[in-house]
Structures are given as C-alpha cells and as structure tokens.
Amino acid sequence: MTTTGHVHFYIGTYTNPPSTSTGIARLSLNTETGELTRLDDVVVQRNPSYLTTTEHGLYTFSEMDRNEGAELAFFRGSESASLPINGDYPCHLDIKEPLLAVANYGSGNVSVFQLDRDGKPLGLLADLYVDGCGPNLERQTSPHAHQVTFLKHSHQLVVVDLGSDSVLIYDYDAQPPDFSLSQVIHLPAGSGPRHVVFNQQESTAYVVCELSETLIVLVKHQDKWLISNQTELLEGEENQQAAAAIRLSQDETFLYVSCRAQNKISVFDVSGDTPKRRAAIHCEGVFPRDFVLSHDQKWLLVANQHSNNVVSFRRNPQTGEITATGYDCEIGSPVCIVEQPL
C-alpha cells in the first residue's frame, strides 16, 4: 500500500516465547529517507510465518503441528476464515485461483485447497506426497516440502523438497482437481533445496540450496528442466547450512540471496548464462530469514529473525547495489515480509 511518500508492508512472525509478537505486524517505509515506522498489528495469529496477498485479501497459516492446530487463515477487512491443515509445520503457500497450495515442512506433504470466487478457502482438494530422503541424517531422513509455486504460463505446480534434494513438477487440471507428477529434478545429494524463483518466461529457474549454501540454475529444454550450473553463495566462507530467501529483480538482471548464519545478503549479476557474484552485504542484524524488493525496485527490506528487527536498504536499480539506510524497526522474530497492495 502506498500513501504519499510511504509504502506499507505486512510482517509475518513467530509468536512463541521469547518472541514478543502476537501475529501479523505492519510497518511503513518512508520512500524519501528509508525510515521505518511500526504501525498497528493486523491480526492476532499464532506463528504466521509466511504471508501472501491477492486482490481478495491476506493469506497465512499457523506454523505448528497439526495436533496443535495448524490452520490456513484468510483475512479481508473485518472478515476472516480458517481451515485445518492436514500437515505438520506449514512453511510456504502460493495461489493461482481457484487453487491455493501449502507446503508442510514437517510432514513433507503439500495440501491443495479450493478458493471461491471471492478468494475464501472452501476445502481441501488434493494431498500430494512423494517419499524420499537425503544423506544429511539430521535434516534429510524424510521429505520436507519447503516451497510451492504455481507457474503462470502453464498448469504446473512446483514443489521444492529440502529432505529429498529434489524439485518436483506436477501437471494439474483445476476442474476437476487432478495432479500428476511429470518430472522430478534431482539436485546434488545433501544440497537441501529451499526456494526457487523463475524468470518471467519461466525458461530459467534459480534454486537456493539451504544445506550446501549454493545457487543452482535450471534451464528448460523441450519441456524438461535441466541443471545448468551451480555457484557458491559466499566466496571463501565456511558452509553453515543456513541459506534462506531468494529474490530476482524485475528486470531479471540481479539476484539476491540471504545467508542467515553469516548475516549477509549475497548479490549476483544474472544477466548472462552464469551467475556472477557481485557483493555480500551485511544484513544489519542477525539471521536474515526473509527480505523483499519493493514494487518500485528502489528498496530492499530485510527481516532479521534473531535480532528482532526489520532493516531498510536503498537499492540502485541500474547497478543492483544495496546500501543500508541506518533505519530499522523493532519487531519480535520477523520471518516474512510482503508489500501491502494498493
């Protein structure tokens, strides 16, 4: 949401102690200075750790075990709706109406819900699960779905699975709901893929691997995805198995990845065939779980989970360079940032 000289953002949080958060927070960015101001919280919700918005409203979930009450939640003004999630520790969701998909990290399955014409969740349509594991005995003894993405130009759902070192591509028909696994992209053993972003043509994909702290480029060839190359996120630094968020600039020239253990944002030039590392910038906090590029591409905001702050960076759209403004906003355990729609 934009007012004169200000842009507003929703902040997803963890609410379990010692966090002081109670749900979804909101802040305002001064687009002249980069100053951040805490606004009134939006809703009280336990562990709303990921958010997304559409023209219909705001969507989140409670990240917890299904026996504790994991649920999908929808908010539009004073209206709200919720549905139980048949999965453990949901961590990501995506929407392509009339479908909404949730990645359940703990149980490894993906829950697909139907939305009505006004965006309200109606019920569960499909439950997707592919068994698998990886060599990391602490993190990969079973599947861990970490992200879901509906492709814009095809009827396909992409699932990134950290536990099985794979990216799964499902073909689907919305009416009636029918999902079929069309490709499993096997990534290097122990890489632990977390999130993926696509270029606008959906011909190239960039996968951030949490466990190996690498960036893997996928290219589409004759309707199949192939690994093109792999690059370390940070040069000359010890791998600490904690890479997190990834964002591609609108002009598809620059790519940003957060490295939580090293407290850095890694910047890549992806204008060519091979990503080129340009910089690694300190996040001005501790454990950068998420970050977002503003719609005008002039700002980058970072959610530092362990230092309980959101920090603003000024961004040069031509060079991709980000520069800390010196402003931050205190929020307990911030883990997701989404720009509020107009």
Regions found by a protein language model. Give the residues of each.
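Short loop/turn segments immediately following beta-strands, especially the blade-tip
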Residues: 27-34, 113-122, 171-177, 218-225, ...
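Blade-loop segments of beta-propeller domains
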Residues: 37-97
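A short beta-strand motif characteristic of beta-propeller blades
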Residues: 37-43, 79-84, 126, 133-138, ...
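Beta-rich, blade/repeat-based domains predominating
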Residues: 45-56, 86-99, 131-154, 187-202, ...
